[in-house]
């Protein structure tokens, strides 16, 4: 099998994990590195990259042309609307959904002095910093994890925010502050590796063996809630679902770009019929003003 992926250290680590799991199933695979528009436009904030997913488009194009058999993506990078004949055939077990702060001269974000600069390329993380740490300032940061850590060490930032799962996959044992997911609500599908295939192909059937059912259910619920508010990477929105037995604890939150306004819904829903219940949670977010906040954020960023 031919696995298509981006060329960053993190993307290669994710693809290598899939290749290793396939080998354990007796399936040999090779890795093909593909440059995406998200890799090329390194100086643009992520919210300025419009259209079909900046980090997945070119890889999916090659998948559709049968030049690779599988694509390995971070699930949160995959748009809600996508080519009909591509499917997410499997998701691997989620290692962590949490955001973490890597801080230069303090133990916690709360210990940083007023005016300290926090690096993030996410409108969601920036809005949550403004809400929970109003004395701090955010500044856009791009580049791979190594580049961001170097910028932190060089003093361009006092702290940077990253996904914990990425640090785990890269084998980086850093001193971090793990941010409470019920205050600092993660992005929908954060921390999940997805394997995409052409619908109805033998490859799609083979990789189904790697699917983690609990992660599949949790991420499906998160995705439905986010879709109800058209919550792409532009919107300051977090959605986090955790399954415990036959129930799923769900929290959805939308913020204004400055973090001052917040719409939040938290509920426990049953696993049985969870997709319909997720739609209801999304509708509650909309009725509470979440869609209005999301639309205002999009308009402000388009100016």
UniProtKB/Swiss-Prot annotation:
> Which InterPro entries does this entry report, sorted A to Z?
HemC, Porphobilin_deaminase_cofac_BS, Porphobilin_deaminase_N, Porphobilinogen_deaminase_C, Porphobilinogen_deaminase_C_sf
Q: Which cysteines are joined by disulfide bonds?
A: none
Task: Identify the keywords attached in UniProt to this record, alphabetized.
Answer: Porphyrin biosynthesis, Transferase
Name the Gene Ontology molecular function terms of this record: hydroxymethylbilane synthase activity
Q: What is its EC number?
A: 2.5.1.61
* Reaction(s) this enzyme catalyzes, per UniProt: 4 porphobilinogen + H2O = hydroxymethylbilane + 4 NH4(+)
Q: Which SUPFAM superfamilies match?
A: Periplasmic binding protein-like II, Porphobilinogen deaminase (hydroxymethylbilane synthase), C-terminal domain
Remarks, miscellaneous = The porphobilinogen subunits are added to the dipyrromethane group.
Q: Per the UniProt entry, what is one GO biological process?
A: protoporphyrinogen IX biosynthetic process
Q: Which residues carry this modification: S-(dipyrrolylmethanemethyl)cysteine?
A: 233
Kindly list the GO CC terms recorded for this protein. cytoplasm
The identity of this protein, by name, is Probable porphobilinogen deaminase
The record's cofactor note says: Binds 1 dipyrromethane group covalently.
Q: Which source organism?
A: Methanocella arvoryzae (strain DSM 22066 / NBRC 105507 / MRE50)
The keyword Transferase belongs to this UniProt entry's keyword annotation? yes
Position of the signal peptide = none
Gene coding for it: hemC
Q: What is the recorded function of this protein according to its Swiss-Prot or TrEMBL entry?
A: Tetrapolymerization of the monopyrrole PBG into the hydroxymethylbilane pre-uroporphyrinogen in several discrete steps.
Named in its record, the pathway it takes part in is: Porphyrin-containing compound metabolism; protoporphyrin-IX biosynthesis; coproporphyrinogen-III from 5-aminolevulinate: step 2/4
Which cofactors is this protein said to need?
Answer: dipyrromethane
Q: Which family does it belong to?
A: Belongs to the HMBS family.
């Amino acid at each position: 099998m031919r696995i298509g992926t981006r060329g960053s250290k993190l993307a290669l680590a994710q693809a290598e994990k899939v290749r290793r799991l396939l080998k354990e199933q007796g399936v040999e695979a090779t890795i093909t590195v593909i440059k995406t528009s998200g890799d090329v436009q390194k100086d643009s904030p992520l919210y300025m990259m419009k259209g079909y997913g900046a980090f997945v488009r070119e890889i999916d194009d090659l998948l559709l042309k049968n030049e690779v058999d599988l694509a390995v993506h971070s699930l949160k990078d995959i748009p809600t609307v996508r080519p009909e004949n591509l499917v997410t055939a499997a998701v691997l077990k989620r290692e962590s959904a949490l955001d973490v702060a890597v801080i230069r001269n303090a133990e916690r974000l709360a210990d940083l002095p007023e005016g300290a600069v926090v690096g993030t390329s996410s409108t969601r993380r920036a809005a949550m910093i403004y809400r929970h740490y109003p004395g701090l300032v955010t500044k856009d940061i791009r580049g791979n994890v190594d580049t961001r850590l170097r910028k932190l060490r060089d003093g361009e930032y006092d702290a940077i925010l990253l996904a914990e799962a990425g640090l785990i996959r890269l084998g980086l044992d850093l001193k971090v502050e793990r941010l409470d997911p019920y205050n600092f609500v993660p992005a929908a599908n954060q921390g999940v590796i997805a394997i995409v295939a052409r619908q109805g192909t033998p490859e799609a059937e083979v990789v189904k063996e790697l699917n983690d059912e609990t992660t599949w259910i949790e991420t499906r619920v998160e995705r439905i809630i986010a879709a109800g508010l058209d919550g792409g990477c532009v919107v300051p929105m977090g959605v986090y679902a955790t399954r415990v037995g036959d129930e799923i604890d769900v929290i959805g939150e939308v913020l204004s770009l400055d973090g001052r306004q917040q719409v939040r819904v938290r509920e426990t829903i049953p696993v049985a019929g969870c997709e319909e219940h997720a739609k209801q949670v999304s509708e509650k977010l909309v009725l509470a003003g979440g869609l209005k906040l999301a639309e205002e954020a999009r308009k402000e960023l388009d100016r």
